[in-house]
Amino acid sequence: MRDEDHFLKMLDEMVIHQQNKLLKLARDRIPHLTPEDIRNPQDFPELERDPIFNYEDEMLNGYLSVRSSYQAWLKE
């Protein structure tokens, strides 16, 4: 496996881990939430006001941004 593939695999694992962490955190606050629900936390005021949830959500967004940027860079 190439180094590029190893890095993408690692990023994928980080994204999955963070998605699971975020869903668990959200469900601790609102038990019935789905993975789709947490993509729109503004629909849930309790999540929108939660600084821990927002921090973890931004961590996920950061991982996704790195992955997207890295894939674009590989195509250049």
Label for each model-derived stretch:
Residues 1-27:
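Short, charge/polar-rich alpha-helical segments
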Residues 20-34, 68-75:
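Charged/polar positions within long, soluble alpha-helices
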Residues 33-72:
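Short, charge-rich amphipathic interface segments used for partner binding and complex assembly
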